[in-house]
A protein has these predicted regions:
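RNA pseudouridine synthases
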Residues: 1-142
Length: 144
């Protein structure tokens, strides 16, 4: 798979992660963005040594979006410092069937992670290891 790289220099890579591809995986033989980008760096490098690549943040496997990776330890340290100091937002766009009752709102539910299948499911607040999931939304376009 050829990565969709939006920006690359000697320190960082910004790429588009397709839906369905994990950011990284511990399962050998399955494609993930770390493997794909390490192959890209290796193929385009004159050094032909194992490339350094640090994951700065992740996106869930079903999600498509931008990812930032560091190509050097110094860049990883600086990007992580910036992330800790300033943070950043994750903004999602979705196509809905039907329309929420209000144009802005907050949806809240509880999720529990299943480590065996690496999935999460909706649960009750009383479920052991349940974590609150909160989504703030704003309808930007309504087409009737």
């Amino acid at each position: 798979m050829k990565p969709h790289i939006l920006y690359e220099d000697q320190d960082i890579i910004v790429c588009l992660k397709p839906a369905g591809i994990p950011t990284q995986t511990s399962r050998p033989g399955l494609p993930d963005m770390v493997s794909i980008l390490k192959n890209h760096i290796y193929q385009n490098s004159a050094h032909k040594k194992q490339p350094y690549l640090a994951v700065i943040h992740r996106l869930d496997q079903p999600v498509e979006g931008l990812l930032v990776f560091a190509k050097t330890p110094a860049a990883a340290k600086e990007l992580n410092r910036q992330l800790q100091s300033f943070g950043f937002g994750k903004y999602y766009q979705a196509v809905l069937l039907g329309c929420p009752q209000t144009a802005d709102g907050i949806l809240e539910d509880y999720l529990v992670k299943d480590g065996r299948t690496n999935t999460s499911r909706i649960c009750t607040e009383e479920t052991p290891d349940a974590k609150v999931a909160r989504l703030s939304y704003h309808l930007s376009l309504i087409h009737i």
